[in-house]
Amino acid sequence: MSTTQTNQTPIKKYYSINELTALGIGSRTKIDRLAKQGLLKKIKIGGSVRFSADEVNAFIQSTNA
């Protein structure tokens, strides 16, 4: 009897600016400022700006510490 292993890459979550404002991170202006300061790393996917959920969670934890 043999077992098979599947190599699955986890699906990463990305947030839009509108989703970040809904989460209470701040206004569009504040989110742009945080990105320019390097506190949130923005990623361009196609013509859209997105933020990695991992980056957002790390930012939230650092501000709550």
UniProtKB/Swiss-Prot annotation:
It holds the Pfam family HTH_17. This is Uncharacterized protein PM1772. The lineage of its organism: Bacteria, Pseudomonadati, Pseudomonadota, Gammaproteobacteria, Pasteurellales.
